[in-house]
Design a protein with these regions (language model features):
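Helix-turn-helix repeat elements of alpha-solenoid scaffolds
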Residues: 86-98, 125-138, 167-178, 207-217, ...
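DNA major-groove recognition helix of helix-turn-helix/homeodomain DNA-binding modules
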Residues: 45-69
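Residue register of alpha-helical TPR repeats
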Residues: 114, 154, 194, 232-234, ...
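Amphipathic alpha-helical segments of tetratricopeptide repeats
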Residues: 100-104, 137-144, 177-187, 217-224, ...
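A short, Lys/Arg-rich alpha-helix, primarily the initiator
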Residues: 1-17
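Short alpha-helical DNA-recognition segment
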Residues: 17-36
Length: 420
């Protein structure tokens, strides 16, 4: 992409409109001045640029050519035009390498930093967390060098998100902690609020429930009840109490939230009833648990189909816990169909593991082997080597019990190859 100097723009525009230098003459603009500007012997002044732009527009009108031009275009340097071009490109959904090439050529630091940040967003959306992290880090280095500190909290937040989504929760906490400190320093309350939620979530993931609960309380100070994240934070709070066995407190939180949602088919109500179903199940209250799951199922079937698989697969445990395996299997399979439709990897895995446990309980070896192979494919697709190793070991033991030495050996070899 070539960007023209002011002198080149005048010359190229004049030729395009089939004008001679004398056609641009005016009371205060001589042909000699035009010639000197076109040969870079004189700089283009603003008052001259205004007059030339008017001449060009007038000629374009005579030729019936749609032609947008003004003095700002004529006065801009190649670097300024390059910056405008790159900014427009960065607004698009596709971020290509041409942008960084132009930014490097003209040393456009703001464009470079923005390019790497957008590239990070693109990699993050594609779940390429390592490359997303690298690009956010590149962006942050440029902003730091350029003393543009206001964006730093956001970039540390994004770097933490990369680590958290890659299940590296301790690493994520390091970046989230830095993000929180910078967000306070630069009075970025929006990022400060966001990062507190994710800090709490990471603490829960690594079983530090007391720290998670303390962080949630800090987060709730920033929240208002019209914000969905107010509910998400309370969901997280309830889940922490569930994890430490305080089921009644967890139930009380959900019941309180339920009263704050007036719409009978709010998707958040589906989540609340689903989790109440899980809590009552953990307490051994199968009747109330089933009632809650059925309410959640009705809501999600109407307004939140992408999460319907969660309710179905969680609901199946009401039946498997009471050894009603036929009904449990039927419900799990319905959940798996929904999970497949909405590409829900977590619940595809969860549902198949539920089937695995049932088939183990009823000693259905044929179906047990089938579901193990399904799980293996899911784990391979997501590079989950640690669980895959355990699964291959389980399969090899099943084959050994059947005296199928070759199949058992094949599973052990597959397990070994994961680490080669």
């Amino acid at each position: 992409m070539k960007f023209l100097t002011p002198s080149e723009k005048i010359k190229e525009t004049r030729k395009f409109l089939k004008m001679k230098q004398e056609d641009l003459q005016d009371e205060n603009v001589s042909r000699g001045l035009i010639s000197m500007i076109e040969t870079d012997q004189r700089a283009l002044a603003k008052n001259v640029a205004i007059k030339l732009a008017e001449k060009f527009k007038q000629k374009a009108k005579e030729l019936d050519i749609k032609f947008e031009i003004d003095e700002n275009f004529l006065l801009r340097s190649p670097a300024e035009d390059a910056e405008l071009y790159c900014l427009k490109k960065l607004e698009g959904s596709i971020i290509n390498e041409e942008i960084i090439e132009i930014a490097c050529k003209f040393n456009l630091l703001e464009i470079k930093a923005s390019f790497y940040s957008k590239k990070g967003d693109s990699f993050l959306a594609r779940k390429d967390y390592d490359n997303a992290f690298i690009n956010y880090n590149n962006s942050m280095s440029i902003y730091n060098d350029n003393k543009q500190h206001e964006i730093i909290p956001h970039l540390y937040f994004q770097m933490g998100i990369c680590k958290a989504r890659d299940y590296k929760y301790n690493d994520a906490l390091l970046y989230f902690d830095i993000c929180e400190r910078y967000s306070v320093m630069y009075k970025d309350t929006k990022t400060q609020k966001l990062v507190l939620y994710d800090i709490a979530l990471c603490y829960k993931k690594i079983d530090k429930f007391d720290l998670a609960l303390k962080t949630i309380q800090k987060y709730l100070l920033f929240s208002n009840k019209k914000d969905n994240f107010y509910f998400y934070a309370n969901f997280l709070k309830s889940n922490c109490y569930k994890a430490i066995g305080k089921y009644d407190i967890a139930i009380e939180i959900y019941n309180s939230l339920r009263a704050e949602l007036p719409k009978p088919e709010d998707p958040l109500l589906g989540y609340i009833y689903n989790n109440l179903g899980v809590l009552y199940l953990d307490k051994g209250d199968f009747k109330t648990s089933l009632e809650c799951f059925e309410r959640a199922e009705k809501i999600r079937d109407a307004v939140d189909k992408n999460n319907l698989c969660h309710t179905l697969i969680d609901k199946s445990k009401v039946f498997s816990s009471q050894h009603f395996y036929v009904e449990a299997i039927k419900i799990i399979n319905l959940g798996l169909i929904s999970a497949e439709t909405y590409k829900d990897y977590e619940y595809l895995l969860k549902g198949n593991y539920s089937l695995l446990r049932i088939y183990e309980s009823i000693d259905d070896i044929s179906n047990l082997k089938k579901v193990c192979l399904v799980i293996a494919d899911l784990l391979k697709d997501n590079n989950n080597f640690s669980e895959l190793t355990l699964l291959y070991t389980k399969l090899s033991l099943i084959y050994l019990n059947e005296n199928d030495i070759e199949k058992a050996k094949e599973c052990l070899i597959l397990s070994q190859k994961l680490y080669e």
